[in-house]
Design a protein with these regions (language model features):
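Generic internal hydrophobic packing segments that stabilize the cores of diverse globular domains
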Residues: 77-81, 98, 110
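C-terminal accessory helical subdomains adjacent to catalytic cores in phosphodiester-
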Residues: 1-34, 52-67, 88-97, 104-233
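Short, basic/hydrophobic alpha-helical segments
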Residues: 76-92
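Structural motif
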Residues: 39, 99-101
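Short, acidic loop-beta-alpha module within alpha/beta folds
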Residues: 34-52
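Phosphate/oxyanion-binding active-site loops and adjacent basic polyanion-contact surfaces
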Residues: 42, 46, 69-77, 210-214
């Protein structure tokens, strides 16, 4: 496509901003918004996905900031804390929900990062082994530990079987992946698959929970922010 990947992310944010502005003009007296901060390990793959998700499921009670910082696990948690502080101070506001998005990769401090995030009150949309596991679960249940490259093969095979996608090749940071998953995959099934995977583990050694993901939890919150409002004064 003609745009660079950075321009594509900017375009998604600009379009979402226009939609929010239009909704804002229509509803001056709308109810309080739930403010989300999502800080991702990756600078393209995860931010593109969540920006597209937010744009595709507009809500008058949700405000979302998505950041991609290029660092993982404990370093990501520390950076998230700094980003949260800076944005809240700059904009004179507070985030209601903070989420971190990261993969297991080869990080030895994976469990520590999850614990640290929990202690800070952050949600962790972690994946073991990689974020692309969430994509795979849109097409099939997967409970066998496989290499990251095998996730890619699964995604490509699933989409190549769909009309008009015979030559599909997956690339990290593909800004079109959310649309393809919505068109050809089954998000509700993916959520059920993710929950089933979690129930198959009965300990808190998350580094050994392979495959497993918490991405569906964040997706669900973004799609239903009104649930948070019902639990707060």
């Amino acid at each position: 496509m003609g745009h660079s990947k950075n321009n594509e992310l900017a375009r998604l944010r600009q379009e979402r901003g226009k939609s929010k502005a239009t909704n804002g003009r229509k509803e001056k007296g709308r109810q309080r918004q739930v403010r989300f901060l999502i800080v991702c390990e990756g600078t393209k793959t995860e931010p593109y996905y969540f920006e597209a998700l937010v744009q595709g499921s507009m809500s008058d009670v949700r405000e979302v900031n998505v950041e991609g910082v290029g660092m993982g696990t404990v370093a990501l948690i520390k950076e998230t804390k700094a980003i949260k502080h800076d944005l809240e101070k700059k904009n004179n506001m507070q985030f209601d929900r903070v989420w971190v998005v990261f993969d297991k990769d080869g990080f030895q401090d994976f469990n520590q990062a999850i614990t640290m995030a929990k202690d800070l009150g952050y949600g962790s949309a972690w994946s073991n082994e990689a974020f692309e596991l969430w994509y795979c679960l849109h097409f099939a249940y997967l409970n066998t530990a496989i290499k990251r490259s095998a996730y890619i093969t699964m995604i490509e095979n699933a989409l190549k079987n769909k009309p008009g996608n015979n030559n599909f090749t997956y690339t990290k940071g593909d800004p079109d992946i959310y649309r393809l998953l919505q068109k050809y995959g089954d998000e509700n099934m993916a959520k059920k698959h993710a929950e089933k995977l979690r129930k198959s583990f009965n300990n808190t050694n998350y580094a050994a929970h392979n495959p497993c993901t918490m991405v569906d939890k964040l997706v669900d919150e973004l799609q239903h922010p009104e649930r948070f409002l019902r639990t707060t004064p």
